């Protein structure tokens, strides 16, 4: 396994619309394993392939259990996802490994139902609510070249751009 480099905003790579996965082979399995290792090392709960430079329609989500630990056997590997149903509405404070240090409230569906394939190309259906539903929507957005900051109001977006400039200035002076 290997740690992969996470691509940060404003890289144009993050705006790429990812392509459908067609080969469910050892290379894909290695990519999923490397993505999981990278996500855990970065203290994230979700990671889309495009965030590590792979323009493929796949993502992983590994929510921590009540003890705060993310167990590998709980990791969802979601490939070629499609929304079947969505419902409700909720606000959730989101962050992103590609936009480090910035968190903001985003409106999302409260419940989602998706169809996807696992690493063995088996078709699965998943119903999710609350945090898992939010994470699924956030990561699928990445597959479509959309970031959570794109969903902010104009006022919140200006706040984000200002904070980003300040952060970039600090990093230049280090």
From Swiss-Prot:
Keywords: Hydrolase, Iron, Metal-binding, Protein biosynthesis. The keyword Repeat does not apply. One of its GO terms (molecular function) is metal ion binding. One of its GO terms (biological process) is translation. It is an enzyme of class 3 (hydrolase). Binds 1 Fe(2+) ion. CDD domains: Pep_deformylase. Its cofactor is Fe(2+). The active site is at residue 139. It catalyses: N-terminal N-formyl-L-methionyl-[peptide] + H2O = N-terminal L-methionyl-[peptide] + formate. Fe cation binds at residues 96, 138, 142. Its EC number is 3.5.1.88. Belongs to the polypeptide deformylase family. Removes the formyl group from the N-terminal Met of newly synthesized proteins. Requires at least a dipeptide for an efficient rate of reaction. N-terminal L-methionine is a prerequisite for activity but the enzyme has broad specificity at other positions. PANTHER family: PEPTIDE DEFORMYLASE. This is Peptide deformylase. It comes from Helicobacter pylori (strain G27). The gene is def.
